[in-house]
C-alpha cells in the first residue's frame, strides 16, 4: 500500500475525464482567395492561383462533467510556478478537447498551439483569519470528520463553504452526525474565516458554536471527494491558426475523485482466540471497527475511513490471513466500493479488493 502524501492548501477555488452531453454540430469553414492573370502581352497564357485555408470552429458542449484527481483543478505548490485553477482547466482543454467540444477530434491538431483562456469568476480566498496551525493547535478544539451520511457539496470557489454548509441549524445537523463534534446543547453554529488546511485528502475548516453558555471551536475535516467544483456559465475563449476565434460558454462540473492510497494502519495488539483470527469480521470487531448483534457484524464505515484515510466508500470484510513468518500477525483485507455519486480518481467506481492492513494478536 502506498503511504498517503500530505498536501497543503492555501486558499483558492477549488479535471480525469468523463462525460458529457452536447448539442452543437461540427463546423468547418473555408476561406478562399483567387487571383487571375489574363496575360502578359508575350503570348503566355494566363495563370490562375487558388489558395484555400480551412479553419475549425469550436463547438462547445452545453454541459461538461468530469471526474478526476484534485490536482486537475488545484495545484498544491506554493511557489511562483504554482498554476491557478483557470490555468489547469486550460491545460486540460488542450490535452483533452473531446471532453469540452463536440468536434474535439477535429480540434486536436490545432488547439494545442491555440490561445485558450478560461474565466470561471474565481475569487481570492476570504479565509484570511488566524492560521490553521494556530487555531487547530489549541487544547480545547474538537476534531471530527464529515460523515459519509452527509451530502456532497457543490462549490464555485472555496469561499462558498461559508454558505453551502448552510445556516446554524444545517451545520448543527452536520456536526451531530460526527460523535466528536456532537454537542449536548449546541446553538449558534457558523463557519469562521480562519485559515484552511489540506492534509491527507481532508480540507480542514474552523466551525464555532455554543454549548449552552460555553464557546466551542471545532476542526471540521471535509474529504475533498465530497467537493464538486460547479461553474454555471464557465467562459472559454479560443483563438489561433486554423481555429476560428470564439467566445464560448458551458456549464462545468468537476467531481473530485477518491484517492485510493491508504494510510499505514498499525492498530494496537488485541487478544483473540486463534480459531477466530481468520474471521475478518471478528477481527474488525475486536479492533473496534465493527459491532456485532447476534451473528450480524456491522462495520463502522466512518471509523474505518478515518483509520485508512480512504473516504466515501463502503467497506466490506474479505479475509484475514496469517503471516507466514509470524503467527501473531494477520493481514486483514477489505473491499472498498465508492458510494453512490462518488468515483475513484481514475473516473471508475468499481470495487477495489486490495485494501489491507496488519493486525497483531497477543
From Swiss-Prot:
It is a lipid-anchor. InterPro entries: Lipoprotein_p35 (IPR011653). It is found in: Cell membrane. Residues 1-30 form the signal peptide. A lipid is attached at residue 31 (N-palmitoyl cysteine). Keywords: Cell membrane, Lipoprotein, Membrane, Palmitate, Signal. Its main location: membrane. One of its GO terms (cellular component) is plasma membrane. Residues 33-53 are annotated as: Disordered. The N-terminus is blocked. Pfam families: MpPF1 (PF07668). It comes from the Bacteria. A lipid is attached at residue 31 (S-diacylglycerol cysteine). The dominant B-epitopes are found at the N- and C-terminal regions. Major M.penetrans antigen. Belongs to the p35 lipoprotein family. This is Lipoprotein p35.
Amino acid at each position: 500500500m502506498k503511504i498517503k502524501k500530505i498536501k497543503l492548501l492555501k486558499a483558492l477555488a477549488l479535471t480525469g475525464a468523463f462525460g458529457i452531453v452536447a448539442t452543437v454540430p461540427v463546423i468547418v469553414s473555408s476561406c478562399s482567395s483567387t487571383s487571375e492573370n489574363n496575360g502578359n502581352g508575350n503570348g503566355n497564357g494566363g495563370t490562375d492561383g487558388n489558395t484555400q485555408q480551412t479553419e475549425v470552429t469550436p463547438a462547445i458542449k452545453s454541459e461538461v462533467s468530469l471526474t478526476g484527481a484534485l490536482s486537475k483543478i488545484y495545484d498544491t505548490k506554493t511557489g511562483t510556478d504554482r498554476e491557478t485553477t483557470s490555468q489547469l482547466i486550460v491545460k486540460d482543454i488542450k490535452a483533452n478537447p473531446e471532453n469540452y467540444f463536440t468536434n474535439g477530434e477535429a480540434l486536436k491538431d490545432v488547439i494545442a498551439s491555440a490561445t485558450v483562456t478560461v474565466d470561471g469568476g474565481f475569487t481570492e480566498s476570504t479565509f484570511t483569519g488566524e492560521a490553521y496551525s494556530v487555531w487547530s493547535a489549541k487544547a480545547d478544539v474538537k476534531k471530527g470528520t464529515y460523515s459519509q451520511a452527509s451530502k456532497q457539496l457543490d462549490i464555485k470557489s472555496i469561499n462558498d463553504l461559508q454558505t453551502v454548509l448552510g445556516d446554524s441549524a444545517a451545520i448543527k445537523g452536520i456536526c451531530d452526525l460526527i460523535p466528536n463534534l456532537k454537542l449536548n446543547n449546541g446553538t449558534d453554529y457558523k463557519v469562521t474565516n480562519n485559515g484552511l488546511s489540506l492534509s491527507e485528502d481532508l480540507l480542514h475548516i474552523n466551525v464555532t458554536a455554543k454549548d449552552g453558555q460555553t464557546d466551542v471551536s471545532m476542526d471540521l475535516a471535509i474529504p475533498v471527494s465530497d467537493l464538486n467544483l460547479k461553474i454555471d456559465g464557465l467562459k472559454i475563449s479560443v483563438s489561433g491558426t486554423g481555429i476560428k476565434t470564439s467566445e464560448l460558454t458551458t456549464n462545468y462540473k468537476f467531481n473530485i475523485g477518491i484517492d485510493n492510497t491508504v494510510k499505514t494502519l498499525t492498530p494496537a495488539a488485541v487478544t483473540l482466540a486463534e480459531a477466530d483470527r481468520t474471521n475478518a469480521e471478528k477481527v474488525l470487531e475486536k479492533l473496534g471497527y465493527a459491532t456485532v448483534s447476534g451473528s450480524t457484524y456491522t462495520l463502522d464505515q466512518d471509523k474505518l475511513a478515518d483509520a485508512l484515510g480512504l473516504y466515501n466508500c463502503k467497506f466490506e470484510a474479505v479475509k484475514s490471513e496469517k503471516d507466514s513468518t509470524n503467527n501473531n500477525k494477520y493481514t486483514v483485507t477489505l473491499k472498498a466500493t465508492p458510494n453512490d455519486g462518488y468515483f475513484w480518481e481514475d473516473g471508475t467506481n468499481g470495487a477495489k479488493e486490495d485494501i489491507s492492513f496488519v493486525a497483531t494478536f497477543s
